[in-house]
Amino acid sequence: FLTNDKADHVDEIIDLVQMYGDKVIIHHSGIDIDFVKQKKIDYILSDRYSHIIKRDVIDYLNGNAINTHPSLLPFQRGYQPNFFSILLNTKKGVSIHKIDEGLDTGDIIVQEELFYNDQDTLKTSHYIFRKAIVSLLCKNWYKILNENILPIPQERKGNINYKKDFDIFFAQLSNGWCTTVEEVKNILKNKPLIRVEPKKFPAKKSHS
């Protein structure tokens, strides 16, 4: 189980995996092929992990590596996707997808659209999407493990957000994470939009 040392609400996901009789190794730092072989890892579940998983690791696991992501991919890839879903007024939601070499570009396994009201805050919206991710995993974990869900390739559109963009906008919020959804949406009203240009993604190469 790959995550970061500041991530909250990870116990529910760990408990879910252990409920199916699997041993869970919790890891925060980077991994390589030697680590995977030494620990005899056969599946990776990534949740808010901050390191790149290299191609040789993905190939060694035969694609058995998935990630949770708090947006309706292909929109809001990258940093703080929930925040940018609100700011840029795109659909909100959560996705579970295969891990590939790209940034949140892997095939989509399952998704769920979410809805916030204007008086929700960034903090309460975080609580909502975390519960949704856990629920989505609970409903589909057995089917994911047994490959009973056919992953769907992502459309080659969408956008990527970066920490430097988030820092610019978040600095304008006097209430920080207690800022309401309505206030976040209003940041761009009557102000020039600092555009987050869609990144063009090349066609996926076959690794046969």
Residues of each region from the PLM?
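One-carbon transfer enzymes
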Residues: 1-208
